[in-house]
Amino acid sequence: MADARRPLTAGERALAASVFRDTIDYDAVRLSRSKWAFFQPRDTVMAPRGCIHFHPKGQGWRDDFAAAALTDQGLFIHEMVHIWQHQRGIFLPLARHPWCRYDYAIKPGQPLHRYGIEQQGEIVRHAFLLRRGAKVPGAPSLTQYETLLPFRGA
């Protein structure tokens, strides 16, 4: 299958901007229905170098994440955290090791960059879901997330 890349839709740009404000170059972002590497599992989404890769036989691809279910939008926001990290100069193929943790405990006063790269993705995803009224089991209050995120303002 040829690499089917596309830019963000207008809705996806607005969805991402509702979280990241102007901290991402949205014109540079691409979504691809191709594996990033031969070892990418079918239902794993990867965004190591500024493009979000969906396995062509996986179930994650959406034509427009802004029109998708809230859980799918949460996945999109998690992957956009990796785009944000990449655009800040983090070389994710080296920063993301096989034992990266997704689970986290918010520590008062600890800035987002002090959490692991996958923990950052989950923290931002959970804040996004809470803002939209979803329940996130075990999550602290939205107020705690809001003090942690560096995208406030705008």
Predicted features along the sequence, with ranges:
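Acidic/histidine-rich, surface-exposed loop or edge segments in extracytoplasmic proteins
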Residues: 1
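Metalloprotease/metallohydrolase-associated module, dominated by Zn2+-dependent proteases
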Residues: 4-24, 30, 47-49, 87-154
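Phenylalanine-focused residue identity feature
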Residues: 20, 38-39, 54, 65, ...
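Glycine-rich loops and low-complexity Gly/Arg-rich segments
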Residues: 32, 53-58, 77-80, 99-101, ...
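Catalytic zinc-binding patch centered on the HExxH motif and its immediate surroundings
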Residues: 33-55, 61
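Short pre-active-site segment immediately N-terminal to the catalytic Zn-binding motif
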Residues: 44, 55-77, 112-113
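Active-site recognition of the HExxH zinc-binding catalytic motif
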Residues: 74-86
